[in-house]
Amino acid sequence: MQSIATRNVIIGAGAMGSAAAYRLARRGEPVLLIEQFPLGHDRGSSHGAARITRHSYADPSYARLMPAAFQAWKELEADAGQSVYIRTGGVSFSPAGFDYGACVAANLESVGVPHRRMTGADWNRVNPIFSVPATHDVVFEPDAGMLAAARAVALQLELARTHGGEKTQVMPSTPVRRIDLDGTRPVVVTDSLTIATDRLIVTAGAWVKHLLPRLPIPLVATRQQVLYFRPSDPAPFRIGRFPVFIFKGSGEDEAFFYGMPGFLGTGIKVARHFVGPETDPDVEDRTVADAYCEIVRGFLRNHIPALAGAPIDLTETCLYTVAPDEHFLVDFLPGRSDVIVASPCSGHGFKFSCLIGQVLADMATGGPGHERGELDLLPAWKLARPS
């Protein structure tokens, strides 16, 4: 087995890993990025045409970070000369008397993001394709939209190579068998290489706990199911007419649904955000249950009836990696300044990934944000997080 040494190793070439590689390469840092599957694969959490981006968060800490997250994507677009953000507008709605809408509106106000708060009846007049219960609480954010997910990951990998030249190396289809932390430097072991590195960033998603089994917080990988509907009349669901949406239930109806317009030839994406039973990420299961499809159709019948009977012409699965509190994990390993872990994202991290790549580069190089104070990252993202 060959032994090599390098300065920066990143494990995992999804949203977080590609962003970290891009940001490090822009700074002139050598980067070795290792991915167990082919680049652009659909086995993890970063594939698919699009993801929602929005300032609309009920948690004020995430809402405060979203302007910086939007700015990070703008910087990527300027560097690449291509767009990844698609402005569609976004609507968040919830039952009357539930504090979700009030929290979202208050947080948008606090960060200075334009928005309108209204009743379900008001919203149905604005966009008649919806049939939201009249008393529901609705918040509309004009600047919410979508991120071209697969394109964004590919662009960051391309730019990492452009900025880094020969100093950027990408190793696809290369599983990491173990990480040795017994010596003075982290050592990454593949089937053919032993790699000693000055700094190791682990952005391996659902495989993080396999590579770092002694993490002090339990992480759970769950399989998510996504549906794409093909309505007979697509016009009301096109970008410019149909916004991204978030529905948050309350009481006995604690369901959390989301959706977005068709993009790059896909149908209308609708799914339930749900932390289900734990799954083994190495066991590939692409089935989507009929019962799940009926749950989603039931939601549509009550809120977007014109879509409820549309055929499903595509299904996808992906993985969430979830912490018990559903926050992110971005931190140094305890007692190590040379090993950084950046996962899970608990099902809502893609919109932050370009920003987190910048933070990871700061942490790895001792840059201006390496203490993370300047970006006000959450104490809840640390391994030793508040209970």
Predicted regions, residues:
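Beta1/beta-strand and adjacent pyrophosphate-binding region of the FAD-binding site
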Residues: 2-16, 32
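Active-site substrate-recognition segment that forms the wall
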Residues: 22-26, 82-86, 194, 199, ...
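Glycine-rich FAD pyrophosphate-binding loop
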Residues: 25-45
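Dinucleotide-binding Rossmann-like beta1-alpha1 core, especially the glycine-rich loop
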Residues: 50-126, 135-136, 256-257
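Short beta-strand to alpha-helix junction loop
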Residues: 64-67, 92-100, 139-158, 285-292
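Helical element adjacent to the flavin cofactor pocket in flavoenzyme catalytic cores
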Residues: 140-198
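C-terminal catalytic lobe of FAD-dependent flavoproteins
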Residues: 298-387
